[in-house]
Amino acid sequence: AKGGSFEPGDASKGANLFKTRCAQCHSVEQGGANKIGPNLHGLFGRKTGSVEGYSYTDANKQAGITWNEDTLFEYLENPKKFIPGTKMAFGGLKKNKDRNDLITYLKEATK
């Protein structure tokens, strides 16, 4: 389904999605290590490319996007379209419902 916008979803389903699709590259807890991807603690309200000690692509640093429900909703559908040049090797979550569930989980998990 094209378009759509963020709607609160099911955080426990989002947690499962995170475990299977995201956790091999990202940690969420405060002080969590940067892995293949940056630690996601404090994700909401921060700018792209801003985690200390993580080597981002220039594209990511220069995107100047602030992460929130709506930017994540669009980004996670097709990361390389939203930030051309990102090194995130993830094809995206095509279903709105999956993105809603994941973002709902991330809002809690990254606080």
Curated annotation (Swiss-Prot):
Coiled coil: none annotated. Gene3D superfamilies: Cytochrome c-like domain. One of its GO terms (molecular function) is electron transfer activity. Pfam families: Cytochrom_C (PF00034). Binds 1 heme c group covalently per subunit. InterPro entries: Cyt_c-like_dom, Cyt_c-like_dom_sf, Cyt_c_1A/1B. GO terms for cellular component: mitochondrial intermembrane space. It is found in: Mitochondrion intermembrane space. The keyword Heme applies. Belongs to the cytochrome c family. Electron carrier protein. The oxidized form of the cytochrome c heme group can accept an electron from the heme group of the cytochrome c1 subunit of cytochrome reductase. Cytochrome c then transfers this electron to the cytochrome oxidase complex, the final protein carrier in the mitochondrial electron-transport chain. This is Cytochrome c.
